[in-house]
C-alpha cells in the first residue's frame, strides 16, 4: 500500500473527488493543491476511446501553447551544407551534421527539441535508441522533419511552446500545459489549444466516444477529474 506524504494529504482535502470539474475550476483546484517547494508542472491526461494496436486509430500530433511551457527551450537541428547555415541563421541552439550525430550518440542530450532535414533522416534514424525513448526523435508527422526554409517557423513555434502528443500503449495521451505558477487563464488557453489539436487530429478509424475521461494534475498533486462535455467543447470547430 502506497503511503502519501503530509503535503499530499493536505492537498487532497481541497478536492471533492465526487465532482467532475469544469476546466477552469479544475485548474484553480490543481493550482491550490500545488504545495511543493518547486514550481510544479501542470499536466493533462486524456483516456481516449482508441485502440493503440489498431493502425487506423493511431493518434499523434502537435499543439502550440499560446503561453508557452514556462521554460527555456533549447533547439537542436540536424543539417549539413547550406541547410546547416540556415539552421544557424534561424536561431538553432545546436546544429550540425555527421559530427553532431556522433556527439548525440555519445550521450549529448542538452536540448529539448530536435529537428532534421529530410536528407539527414537516414543517418539520424540510427539514433532511435537514444532519442526515441525520450520523445526527441524528429518525425514528419510531428512537423520536425522539414526543409531548411521552414527552420525559422518551426524553431519559433518550439520556443513559444510547441508540444507533441501521442497515444501511449494504454490508450492515454499525457501532455504538459505549463507551470503551476501560471495564471489560471493562461493554463486554460493552453488547454484549449491542446484539446482543439487533439480533436482535429481524430484518427479516421476512431469509433464511439473519442475522449473517455480527462484529468488534470500537478507534478506532486492528486488528479482532478474534469467534466467531459466541457473539455470536449473546448476544441474542434
Curated annotation (Swiss-Prot):
From the UniProt record, give one GO term of the biological process aspect: regulation of translation
Q: Name one GO molecular function term.
A: structural constituent of ribosome
Task: Please give the HAMAP family that the UniProt record associates with this protein.
Answer: Ribosomal_uL1_B
User: Quaternary form?
Assistant: Part of the 50S ribosomal subunit.
Identify this protein by name: Large ribosomal subunit protein uL1
For this UniProt entry, which segments traverse the membrane? none
- Identify the CDD domains for this entry: Ribosomal_L1 (cd00403)
Record keywords, A-Z = Repressor, Ribonucleoprotein, Ribosomal protein, RNA-binding, rRNA-binding, Translation regulation, tRNA-binding
The terms describing its cellular component in GO are: large ribosomal subunit
Q: Could you tell me which InterPro entries the record lists for this protein?
A: Ribosom_uL1_bac-type, Ribosomal_uL1, Ribosomal_uL1-like, Ribosomal_uL1/biogenesis, Ribosomal_uL1_3-a/b-sand, Ribosomal_uL1_CS
Per its database record, what is this protein's job? Binds directly to 23S rRNA. The L1 stalk is quite mobile in the ribosome, and is involved in E site tRNA release. Protein L1 is also a translational repressor protein, it controls the translation of the L11 operon by binding to its mRNA.
Establish whether keyword Membrane is in the entry.
Answer: no
Q: Which Pfam families match?
A: Ribosomal_L1 (PF00687)
Annotated family: Belongs to the universal ribosomal protein uL1 family.
